[in-house]
């Protein structure tokens, strides 16, 4: 995996296939294949890069959906001015302090749920925001969930169903009720997928502080990336 703009050290990852599509077709979407929670017990930037190409799976209201992660953002603890952990400690944000491998779900603008994966050893805040996924299965379920939030608007193309953090959470049926759940079992889990050929790092989107940090990671040239104009 080639990373442009920000050099990182070697990142150990679970066994992967050569491509996300091959990974999806070679086995089941099964929680027995989930990435173990201990895998997330390490630096946030390492986890953020390694999440790209992994498969996010949810079974909510009996509906199975899955997609390949193509865009994420890393957020640190109190020293990261853009992090919720720098401003809050009580309420849903408590999930950012661990344990690792659990969900931190909050509502953006009071409307859209956003899903993060908690990182770092328990007691040290850190999380990776899931910003975009390329749908693999359950596309019509995703589309119905998205269209319910935008009645009367044109149908979304497949690559935009889970493009953007709010869109991803809605498409996968993730809400505030999932804050703090472990992400190695139903209703939401992560499985090893493929390894992207090239990953690009950029400034994070929609923040007013910490813009100099290149902590947004995307699969280069992927159509499901939420704001491709921000890829440099």
Label each PLM-derived region with a short phrase.
Residues 2-232:
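Conserved, well-structured core segments that form or line functional sites
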């Amino acid at each position: 995996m080639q990373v442009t703009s920000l050099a990182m050290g070697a990142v150990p990852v679970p066994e992967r296939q050569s491509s996300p599509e091959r990974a999806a077709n070679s086995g089941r979407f099964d929680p027995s294949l989930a990435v173990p929670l201990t895998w997330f017990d390490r630096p946030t930037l390492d986890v953020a890069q390694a999440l790209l190409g992994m498969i996010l799976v949810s079974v909510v209201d009996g509906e199975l959906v899955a997609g390949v992660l193509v865009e994420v953002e890393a957020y640190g603890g109190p020293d990261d001015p853009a992090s919720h952990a720098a401003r809050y400690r009580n309420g849903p944000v408590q999930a950012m302090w661990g344990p690792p491998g659990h969900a931190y779900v909050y509502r953006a603008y009071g409307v859209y749920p956003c899903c993060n994966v908690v990182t770092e050893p328990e007691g040290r805040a850190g999380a990776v925001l899931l910003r975009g996924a390329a749908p693999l299965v359950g596309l019509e379920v995703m589309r119905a969930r998205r269209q319910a939030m935008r009645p009367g608007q044109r149908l979304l193309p497949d690559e935009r169903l889970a493009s953007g953090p709010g869109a991803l959470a809605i498409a996968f049926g993730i809400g505030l009720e999932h804050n703090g759940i472990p992400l190695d079992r139903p209703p939401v889990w992560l499985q090893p997928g493929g390894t992207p050929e090239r990953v690009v790092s950029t400034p994070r989107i929609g923040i007013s502080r910490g813009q100099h940090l290149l902590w947004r990671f995307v699969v280069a040239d992927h159509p499901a990336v939420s704001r491709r104009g921000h890829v440099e």
